[in-house]
Every structure is written in C-alpha cells, then in structure tokens.
C-alpha cells in the first residue's frame, strides 16, 4: 500500500491529471488498474517494490499511432566496444515515471483510482481528465519516445540512421530503451552539461552510481586493467533453475546432446509442474543477450511451445543442468585488434531428416548459424532453421551466407556512420573492413567468382544480392578451416572438447 500511495502522490505532484465533474467527460471514461512488481538486480537481489497506476488502454476507442522503437542489442554491444576502444567512461540514468512526463495530445478521462477518494467534499461524482500521458495508454510509449528524443536532439545529438535509439555527438554516445538510458562520454564536463540540460528541460531522472553496470537485467563488470567488460545474467539463470526445481541437479558440461531434437509425435506428453513456454522465454532472453553458447539448444526447444513432449522437457533440463554449472559465466567483451567486422557463418544441411516425421516440412530443412564480431568481440549471433528447403549442402551454406550478409551490411553501415562522427584515432578509422569466413568451398566459389550455372541460377538470383559488395572489395569472403569455424556450435550439438574450444574463442572462457 505504501508503494501505491507513493505512486499517487508522484502522479499528482507531476500534474498528470485534473479532477473534474463526471459530466465534463467528452469520451468514454476509462477504468484503471494497479500493477505491482518487485524490481531486482541482475544478481536476483530485491532492489525495490514498485506500484504503477495504469489506464485500461485496451478499452480505448479509435486506432492511434502507437509504435515506439527500443535500442537493438547489437547497438548495445557496439556501444560497449566503442567505449572500450576510446577508453570512455560510462554511466546509466533512469527516468522517473517516464511516461507521465510527456504531454497528452488529446484529452482522456479516467475513473478515480480505487482506494483513493476525491479531493472535493460536495459529493458530486468525479473523474480525472489526463493532462499528461499515463501508463496503459496505447500512445504512451510513442509520446514518451518523442518527448525524450526531442530533449536529446535539441542538444545536438543525432539519431543513427540504422537504429533510432542510438544517439551520438563527437564526444558522447547515448542508448535509449524506454526509460533506461546508457551513456558513454569522453569528458566529465560533457556528461555534466548533458544532465544539466535534461534537468532544465523538466525531465526527472536518477543517475546510477558508478559506471554502466546494470542495463535491462544484465550486469556489466569493467576490468580497467585488462580493458574488458564482462556481461552476465546470474539473476535470470538462478530464476530459471528455481522455476524448474533443479537447484540440486547434476550439472552438465554441454547444453545439448549431439543427437538433433525432433518433433517426437508418439512421445509421452510433458509431465512437469513448470510452464514450458515461460522457461523457453527466459532462455531466449538469456541466449540472445549474453549466452550464445546455448543458442542452438534453445532454438531447438523453442520449436515445441505449442505441444511439448517429455523428450522436449528433458532437453530443457539438459540446458538448465549446463547453466547450473556455468551460472556465473556470460560473455567477455575484449578488443583483439582493429575495428574490423568479421562474420563466421555455417549451415547444417537437412539436420532434422530422420528426426522429424517425413510428412513434416521441417524434416527437410537446414539450419543456419552465424556470429558477427566487431574488433574480435561478438556483437550479434543467430541459430535458426532456414525458412525454405535447400536441395544440397551448397544451397544450405549459401542461404546461410546470404542471411548473415543481410545482417552484417547494416551493421557496417552503422559503424561507418558513428565512427565518422566520433573522435576516433586515425588508425581505427582507416582499418574498418568486413570479412566473412565460410568453410564450404562451393559457397565460397559462388560468392567470390559468381559462376552461375543451370544448377545454381535459381537460388543465386534470390540470394546473391550482396555480390556488388563483394565485387567492390567492401566485403571479403574468405576460406576458413572447419576446426576454426566459430559458428559450428550454433548449428549442431558438439562433444565437450570441441564445444569448449569454440566457447573459449567466442565468449572468452
């Protein structure tokens, strides 16, 4: 109740609404609802209890524009890598009651919050007319984004053409994720000026103590001596272990067995107390942010949310046993050279053949895996089934190559854009290049020589869009030995020796 009272006091102090007679409402009066939650640190400790009073936006009339972007995780890692390269300091700020800081463009009427009485004594029926945005309104995220974006752009910040939530000037970078903001800066005076101007514009925020250590549930630990940043999600891993009841399990050395996981149509139904989709959701957030080592295993189990069998639940337990052993691990961001973009790409041709029933389209599908690095640090990775059926190993490899290029080229564009604006040493500006490492000779030949035959013409027309970048020398496609293929652990289950060798290369441990 204390958190709820604090919320109402904050909203009234902010001038969020005006109390009016109910007869003044020009549109439907919307009900509200309370949302209570416990905010935790990345390590799972309780940070604070929060209460939000929200509008039932699902009952709104009309179809207003609602889209509001958030920063991509590849941009977060780009931010970290560039801050290490430049040896810039970092910090984060959290805007207080963010959505209610934006002015509402069209009036909205809501009922009085349950448990709180009117400030008048005449006994008339009262409601609230919103002056500012409020949580739950469909337009609230968009209004807040436009409000906070204007606060930064008015100070000379530019939006990246590739990520609207990545802002920069010559000596400072900013990440926007709703009300959480990450900042990297060259000088303390740059930061002081930025924060002072935000305050002058009426924005309320709290600056986190120290460096950029906690962002969206991920803990960042900087080692100034070795110039590294370690990303971990110990709190989420512990939550997964607790949710599956595997606190006392026997740990595994790898997250997946070497046999591919299939549909198992005749298998017994899952018989566990925990929610399969809920655990998969947490595993997906973990695998896409700090743990590429479980990406293949998680991609496999994520196929069966609609009808999980006992074998699929067992596969999740295998992942959890591995996480139990490596609960304090994550990914070490360590610069190994210049700011080159490298892409390791691999494919597993028809890996589900014999595992999924012949009538299932997935039984003939191949798997794509790729890891894109910047300065030797992983910035983006993927393990997924290909959307179309490849007719040969060559076609599967080439499809994977094309998919990775579609992701890598925009990253290169963003890097070039940001580096041009930042005050980077000349040696970094002159060494930006793109390299793609492929271990299939046929795919390598097609990508570099463009030898079109009757057998390859039909898929080259569709997937060979990147040829101009290869021909101009902007992108180099190079041969790599299979034993050095970083993406190998994204396409199949591996034995412990091979798996740990690749994990060391990619994640640093």
What are these regions (language model features)?
Residues 1-135, 139-161, 166, 243-245, ...:
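Chromodomain-type histone methyl-lysine reader module
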Residues 4, 11, 34, 44, ...:
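Mobile genetic element proteins and their domesticated derivatives, centered on retroelements
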Residues 13, 24-30, 45-47, 82-85, ...:
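Intrinsically disordered, low-complexity regulatory regions enriched in Ser/Pro/Gly/Thr
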Residues 39, 99-112, 135-139, 169-204, ...:
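Catalytic palm subdomain of template-directed nucleic-acid polymerases
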Residues 42-46, 86, 90-91, 117-123, ...:
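Short helix-interrupting loop/turn segments at helix-coil junctions
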Residues 67-70, 74-76, 172-173, 227, ...:
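Divalent metal-binding acidic/histidine catalytic loops
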Residues 92-97, 127-137, 161-185, 211-221, ...:
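Catalytic palm active-site di-aspartate
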Residues 155-162, 182-237, 242-244, 324-326, ...:
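Polymerase palm active-site segment centered on the conserved acidic dipeptide of motif C
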């Amino acid at each position: 109740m204390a958190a709820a009272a604090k919320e109402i006091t904050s909203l009234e102090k902010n001038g969020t609404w005006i109390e009016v007679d109910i007869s003044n409402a020009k549109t439907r009066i919307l009900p509200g609802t309370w949302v209570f939650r416990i905010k935790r640190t990345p390590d799972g400790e309780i940070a604070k209890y929060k209460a939000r009073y929200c509008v039932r936006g699902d009952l709104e009339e009309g179809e207003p524009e609602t889209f509001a972007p958030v920063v991509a995780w590849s941009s977060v890692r780009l931010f970290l890598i560039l801050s290490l390269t430049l040896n810039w300091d970092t910090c984060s700020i959290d805007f207080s009651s963010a959505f209610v800081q934006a002015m509402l463009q069209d009036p909205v009427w809501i009922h009085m919050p349950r448990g709180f009485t009117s400030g008048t004594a005449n006994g008339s029926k009262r409601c609230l007319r919103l002056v500012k945005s409020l949580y739950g309104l469909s337009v609230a995220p968009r209004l807040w984004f436009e409000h906070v974006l204007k606060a930064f752009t008015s100070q000379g910040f530019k939006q990246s053409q590739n990520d609207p939530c990545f802002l920069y000037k010559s000596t400072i970078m900013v990440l926007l994720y709703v009300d959480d903001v990450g900042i990297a800066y060259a000088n303390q005076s740059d930061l002081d000026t930025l924060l002072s101007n935000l305050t002058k514009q009426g924005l309320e925020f709290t600056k986190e103590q120290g460096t950029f250590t906690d962002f969206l549930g991920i803990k960042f630990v900087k080692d100034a001596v070795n110039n590294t940043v370690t990303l971990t999600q110990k709190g989420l891993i512990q939550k997964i272990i607790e949710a599956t009841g595997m606190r006392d399990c026997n740990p595994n050395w790898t997250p997946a067995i070497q046999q591919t996981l299939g549909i198992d149509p005749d298998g017994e139904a899952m018989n566990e107390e925990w929610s399969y989709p809920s655990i998969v959701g947490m595993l997906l957030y973990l695998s896409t942010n700090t743990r590429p080592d479980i990406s293949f295993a998680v991609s496999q189990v994520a196929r069966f949310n609609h009808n999980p069998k006992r074998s699929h639940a067992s596969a999740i337990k295998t992942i959890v046993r591995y996480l139990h052993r490596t609960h304090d691990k994550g990914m070490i961001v360590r610069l190994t050279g210049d700011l080159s973009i490298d892409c390791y790409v691999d494919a597993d041709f028809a890996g589900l053949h014999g595992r999924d029933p012949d009538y299932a389209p997935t039984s003939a599908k191949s798997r794509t895996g790729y890891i894109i690095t910047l300065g030797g640090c992983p910035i983006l990775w993927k393990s997924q089934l290909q959307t179309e059926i490849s007719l040969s190993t060559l076609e599967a490899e080439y499809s994977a190559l094309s998919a990775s290029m579609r992701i890598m080229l925009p990253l290169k564009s963003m890097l070039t854009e940001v580096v041009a604006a930042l005050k980077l040493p000349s040696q970094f500006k002159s060494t930006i290049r793109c390299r793609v490492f492929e271990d299939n000779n046929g795919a390598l030949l097609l990508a570099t020589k463009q030898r079109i035959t009757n057998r390859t013409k039909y898929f080259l027309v569709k997937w060979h869009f990147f040829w101009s970048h290869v021909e101009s020398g902007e992108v180099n496609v190079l041969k790599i030995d299979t034993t050095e293929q970083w993406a190998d652990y994204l396409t199949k289950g591996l034995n412990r020796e091979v798996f740990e060798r690749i994990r060391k290369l990619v994640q640093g441990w």
